Amino acid sequence: MSYPGYPPTGYPPFPGYPPTGQESSFPPPGQYPYPSGFPPMGGGAYPPAPSSGYPGAGGYPAPGGYPAPGGYPGAPQPGGAPSYPGGQGFGAPPGGAGFPGYPQPPTQSYGGGPAQVPLPGGFPGGAMPSQYPGGQSPYPSQPAPMTQGTHGTIRPAANFDAMRDAEVLRKAMKGFGTDEQAIIDVVANRSNDQRQKIKAAFKTMYGKDLIKDLKSELSGNMEELILALFMPSTYYDAWSLRNAMKGAGTQERVLIEILCTRTNQEIREIVRCYQSEFGRDLEKDIRSDTSGHFERLLVSMCQGNRDENQNVNHQLAQEDAQRLYQAGEGRLGTDESCFNMILATRSFPQLKATMEAYSRMANRDLLNSVSREFSGNVESGLKTILQCALNRPAFFAERLYYSMKGAGTDDSTLVRIVVTRSEIDLVQIKQMFSQMYQKTLGTMIASDTSGDYRKLLLAIVGQ
């Protein structure tokens, strides 16, 4: 179903709610078992995905004597690197090709404020996607956050009472006018799992659909943000993918952002939800909406079969670096399948080690090589994977920055990232944002948005 008065890109029906009398643009929901059907997306890191039976990274045993993942510093940029913000536990660069004058990155502790460093200049010579002016990407290198503790800005509320919260929301919407601040106080301080319980309690207590009531009281970006917060996390990702491919045109950046950054478990749940709620096969929709090497990359991603072993095989990293060089810079033309195979199957810590090995061996950065060998959406997809291997919070910080930079605001991207990362790593995203752009995320949101929409966004990011 669709909600009355909502624009064409409006949200589809939430599972378990009756029709409103308006024809849906999607197949009827399959009553996906939310919220109990999936583990709640609590604060902190993603839950570990169960073993998929997918072979380990190349089948090589981990050699003994190597430090744990993250023990190596990020690969320096050839020709003199900018002073990137450092991650925890990083010391001097290892030996190898050698980069004279490469500075030791300052120590950054997540417990304190961001390190005061100059604005990075991005990857020399590496053309970023077209939305990055001048091809510059202020991208720091640090250990992949999957190996560190990450924290959301929203935690489950203590002494939670779904019926009490439902009553507060009912009073906020009853009579003339709407008490938006009361709605913000509840919604911004409850976890997604708790919001699902409030939604169920509201229907039990009042025999009414909370989402319909909220839609009748809200509009515009505030409505979009509230609806996103009340969607179960997996359903929101599945809906975002469906919305990116339905109708004329395809929002490739949304497909890349979701499929190239989620864990195996999350991707498998998204695939099941997509089928159950929309009656469609995600892989088939990807094949019909994309083509070429970009299609192959996304199909690889939606299998949810990436190796998630956190131990790094440094021998394999050296061999993969050699394979990637020979598939790209070391030959005429490009062996795209080699890039796809390695970047779609290796764990993120393993890819980070491969990037370091590539830099020492080839005396150039792998991200730059991808820019030289690829273009368009497949370039963006491959670089997203590598950027997440280097520093996942920095990738999302960059996406947030460019959603607000310049004239106008990409509110859909702003809402999607703030909502989906709010219980996972938004604390680290805020810290990287400050380091990369010399301003806080809250400051930029406050200057780029207004009204209750701004108040709710700032409440979520913890300003």
UniProtKB/Swiss-Prot annotation:
InterPro entries: Annexin, Annexin_repeat, Annexin_repeat_CS, Annexin_sf. The modification N6-acetyllysine is found at residue 208. Residues 1-140 are annotated as: Repeat-rich region. It holds the Pfam family Annexin. This is Annexin A7. The keyword Phosphoprotein does not apply. Belongs to the annexin family. Gene3D superfamilies: Annexin. It comes from Bos taurus (Bovine). PROSITE patterns: ANNEXIN_1 (PS00223), ANNEXIN_2 (PS51897). Disulfide bonds: none annotated. Residues 5-20 are annotated as: 3 X 5 AA tandem repeats of G-Y-P-P-X. Calcium/phospholipid-binding protein which promotes membrane fusion and is involved in exocytosis. Residues 1-54, 71-153 are annotated as: Disordered. Interacts with PDCD6. GO terms for molecular function: calcium ion binding; calcium-dependent phospholipid binding; phosphatidylserine binding. Keywords: Acetylation, Annexin, Calcium, Calcium/phospholipid-binding, Repeat. Residues 1-18, 26-38 have a biased composition (Pro residues). Annexin repeats lie at residues 160-231, 232-303, 315-387, 391-462. One of its GO terms (cellular component) is cytoplasm. It comes from the Eukaryota. SUPFAM superfamilies: Annexin. The lineage of its organism: Eukaryota, Metazoa, Chordata, Craniata, Vertebrata. Residues 86-99 have a biased composition (Gly residues). A pair of annexin repeats may form one binding site for calcium and phospholipid.
